[in-house]
Amino acid sequence: MSEAEARPSNFIRQIIDEDLASGKHTSVHTRFPPEPNGYLHIGHAKSICLNFGIAEDYQGQCNLRFDDTNPVKEDVEFVESIKRDVEWLGFTWSGDVRYSSDYFDQLYQYAVELINKGLAYVDELTPEQMREYRGTLTAPGKNSPYRDRSVEENLVLFEKMRAGGFAEGTACLRAKIDMASPFIVMRDPVLYRIKFAEHHQSGNKWCIYPMYDFTHCISDALEGITHSLCTLEFQDNRRLYDWVLDNISIDCHPRQYEFSRLNLEYTIMSKRKLNQLVTEKVVEGWDDPRMPTISGLRRRGYTAASIREFCRRIGVTKQDNNVEMMSLESCIRDDLNEHAPRAMAVLDPIKVVIENRAAGEEWLTMPNHPNNPEMGSRQVPFDSEIYIDRADFREEANKQYKRLVLGKEVRLRNAYVIKAERVEKDAEGNVTTLYCSYDAETLNKDPADGRKVKGVIHWVSVAHALPAEIRLYDRLFNVPNPAAAEDFLSTINPESLVIRQGFVEPSLADAVSDKTYQFEREGYFCADSRYSRPGALVFNRTVGLRDTWAAKATQ
């Protein structure tokens, strides 16, 4: 991460400052503990920036630990993608990658300790019965008939669970806390369940797997985590976090702190719903550029710096709030406006023939960035036949239209002034070719007679233009809060992807996916990492030059 990125201030950092000042802790140790059951999204980026950013700023450590306690939903594919995402965002974890499964032997022994203390029991209620016994927010639960088994019987039954002596769903290990607790999470929560599934790390060694709430706190303690940072939905779980650590023989007792999760407009963060988009082929995959996944944003052309800046701007609080999509888009625009080289691309081409110019190429020098000479320049060919965008020509127009009009002039970007003389149309009345004249004395300068030419349009040489598929990506949903809809799929934006067949200038022949360009007057684009290759270019629109949704919202 760049040292130039400002160090933020928030309530968590204030707590850390107080802990260090009081001597409660002499160093800071955080962790990022994703479950490897899907791809990380922009909400995870907030947690990554918080945990790794704190470790960096306080010269501490941050572990990457996979919460891999459910072998049915997890996959090595997700493990590898998460590691790539963390590294791409610019962070380095401390030591080796860790897995909760590394601690399965110790977790089992801690479960046995709770049984020996009379604080855990093997329950044989069915899942349906367990839900019924749990009670509701307004009604207390009731004790399982298996709750008062002896320590000896529970030890035998728990070992039987481990040995595969029970079928899935017929037995589990539960903590013995309080079925009348006002907090449902404390009503004898399940600590271990049976799953006959091969684990991507431990293989077939285990057929019982610890639950998240039991695993999380013990893993934190075993790793010496000082500040365990979670989103607000785990606030009630902190009671169970503390209960487990208070009742086992372990020296370290980390403290859990909660912050608000990221709610971003015009998208969804639910991993289940994101998976539904993928499995029902609403999108191409987890890295579809319309997805809020880090891999999707990366493929779309977002930079790691822009995502870090977004996380810095939205901050860390305890209050839930909805963040406008324009806040994220503003971060990438600011970044790319400063760093993206310029190029010309015509998305909806119309051919222009310059009749008073002899055929033959002329190579024009153009800056790669108008405000940064250090980015150098490039050579762009100009010829007597060029493409311009269809939207940049009208046969008739009012004075507010500053582009090319029949009988009037416009300037070609970094080139000459041209005048529209006549048009050629097809049988349907569509303009197919525009015939123009040019002023040979106006290369990057005003006409000698002082006449004013106000408009500037982009172009590419027909003889040198490279065909390209241009994918115009937009927001995936057409309402700010699709998660609130009865059927979130009904709010899909039908224009979230529009494909154009256009032309780009020859300097983009070898465009690579990790480099984003400003297509002048069109927006920011990058070569698609999956499909683009020399001779078959595919460009994804990262973001437009300005926010068009704000205008739509006021209409």
Swiss-Prot record:
It holds the Pfam family tRNA-synt_1c_C. A motif ('HIGH' region) lies at residues 34-44. L-glutamine binds at D67, Y212. Keywords: Aminoacyl-tRNA synthetase, ATP-binding, Cytoplasm, Ligase, Nucleotide-binding, Protein biosynthesis. One of its GO terms (molecular function) is glutamine-tRNA ligase activity. It comes from the Bacteria. Disulfide bonds: none annotated. ATP binds at residues 35-37, 41-47, 231, 261-262, 269-271. It is an enzyme of class 6 (ligase). PROSITE patterns: AA_TRNA_LIGASE_I (PS00178). A motif ('KMSKS' region) lies at residues 268-272. It catalyses: tRNA(Gln) + L-glutamine + ATP = L-glutaminyl-tRNA(Gln) + AMP + diphosphate. One of its GO terms (biological process) is glutamyl-tRNA aminoacylation. One of its GO terms (cellular component) is cytosol. It is found in: Cytoplasm. Its main location: cytoplasm. The keyword Aminoacyl-tRNA synthetase applies. Its EC number is 6.1.1.18. Belongs to the class-I aminoacyl-tRNA synthetase family. NCBIfam families: glnS (TIGR00440), PRK14703.1 (NF011291). Monomer. This is Glutamine--tRNA ligase. It comes from Yersinia pseudotuberculosis serotype O:3 (strain YPIII). The gene is glnS.
